Design a protein with these regions (language model features):
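N-terminal, positively charged/glycine-rich alpha-helical extensions of SAM-dependent methyltransferases
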Residues: 1-20
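Class I SAM-dependent methyltransferase SAM/SAH-binding core
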Residues: 50-109
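A short acidic, Gly/Pro-enriched loop at the edge of an enzyme's catalytic core
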Residues: 108-119
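A short SAM/SAH-binding and catalytic strip from SAM-dependent methyltransferases
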Residues: 118-131
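Conserved class I S-adenosyl-L-methionine
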Residues: 148-178
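Core SAM-dependent methyltransferase catalytic element
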Residues: 184, 197-217
């Protein structure tokens, strides 16, 4: 693949746009679904939870989230206008029933009041955070006391084999992510690394190592 093509893939993964963006949203939902479910399960969702997700993509997983417990409210934040629209369309029933709420944001400031959420999660977004420490402090601010944050990401050892990650991506190992978290008031209360077979963005089957870090306020 040419450099320009790789750069285009990286840009679409960071911020899907246009027809290619819809395809990318569908593909990300399929290839990341195990990671997303792992993140959701580690939240240990309980009845009445208010849950925030950063960077939900097309949000094809929200139905699974609502199966975890009764009386949940889900709030999704997205930087991509296209994914925001797709997520609202795919989850239109939850939106009309006032169970799911989608908003756009700038990736830095979380447009919600302090201590609103009991659970927060984010999957495959950490590579794109412009100000990681600042964003973690924002998440800390909107979490309730004893609230849980799950950060799920593919390990640097896997990601650096993908040619497009040289653009736009800041890759993380578990150790690097832990060092980042140590700069914030969060406590790490759990971590798990799993390996799964996935089809790469270029089509072949590869082993992917991914990690979920479970943090508590």
């Amino acid at each position: 693949m040419k450099q320009e093509e790789l750069q285009a893939i990286a840009s679409q993964l960071k911020h899907p746009t246009g027809e290619k963006g819809i395809e990318m949203g569908n593909m990300m939902n399929e290839t990341n679904i195990n990671m997303t479910h792992h993140s959701i399960r580690n939240l240990q969702i309980q009845s009445g939870d208010k849950i925030l997700e950063l960077g939900h993509g097309n949000a094809g997983h929200v139905e699974f989230l609502f199966e975890q417990a009764q009386n949940l409210k889900y709030y999704g934040l997205e930087m991509s206008e296209l994914m925001y629209q797709e997520a609202r369309q795919i989850n239109r029933n939850f939106v009309s029933q006032k169970q799911a709420f989608f908003s756009l944001y700038d990736g830095n400031k979380i447009p919600f009041e302090d201590a609103l959420f009991s659970k927060v999660f984010t999957v495959n977004t950490i590579y794109f955070w412009e100000n990681p420490e600042q964003l973690l402090l924002e998440i800390y601010r909107v979490l309730q006391s004893k609230g849980i944050l799950c950060i799920t990401f593919a390990e640097e050892s896997f990601m650096k084999q993908l040619p497009f990650t040289q653009f736009e991506f800041d890759l993380y190992s578990t150790e690097k992510a832990e060092k980042l978290i140590e700069k914030t008031p969060f406590k790490i209360i759990g971590k798990e690394t799993l390996t799964e077979k996935v089809k790469s963005k270029t089509g072949e089957l590869v082993d992917r190592n991914f990690t979920t870090l479970v943090l508590e306020k």
